[in-house]
A protein has these predicted regions:
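Active-site loop-to-helix "anion-binding N-cap" substructures in soluble metabolic enzymes
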Residues: 1-151
């Protein structure tokens, strides 16, 4: 295992890459990651990095978010089949159609959504700031909140 870790660290240096690992990853992945955190923290680290390559060890929407924030960088996702049930519960085409059918509404989406959902969103929130953001709008504001109403 030490040889593998050594090889990974050498490749990170050679390629000017960083590894971002989500809290849900196995300990072995977290051990080699340069940064470990939730989806928001990983996005923030991606946005700040000087690295040319970002290796995202998390679900696919996290890689999409990193690419949106860092369009000039190469973003690699360790497992494209790794999904998020919350993000998967909100198909972008259906969400976009729903938004289209409700003109004049402010669209707020949770950070755990795909880039395609975020593209039709006015405000992206986290679990930490969702209540504060929603309450900052006038009481009569028409709001669509996705992907679910339970947050």
């Amino acid at each position: 295992m030490n040889e593998l870790i050594k090889a990974i660290n050498e490749l990170k240096k050679e390629k000017n890459a960083i590894i971002l690992g989500h809290y849900y990853q196995k300990g072995e992945i977290q051990d080699i990651a340069d940064y470990v955190g939730d989806s928001l923290a990983l996005a923030q680290w991606a946005a700040k990095t000087e690295a040319d390559i970002i290796v995202m060890c998390g679900v696919h929407f996290m890689g999409e978010t990193a690419k949106v924030l860092c369009p000039d960088k190469k973003v690699l996702v360790s497992d494209m089949a790794a999904g998020c049930s919350l993000a998967d519960s909100c198909p972008a085409d259906q969400f976009a159609q729903f938004v289209k059918e409700h003109p004049g509404y402010t669209v707020i989406s949770y950070v755990n959504t795909t880039a395609a959902v975020k593209a039709v969103t006015d405000v992206v929130v986290t679990s930490t700031n969702a209540k504060q953001i929603v309450e900052s709008f006038p009481k009569d504001e028409k709001i669509i909140f996705g992907p679910d109403r339970n947050l």
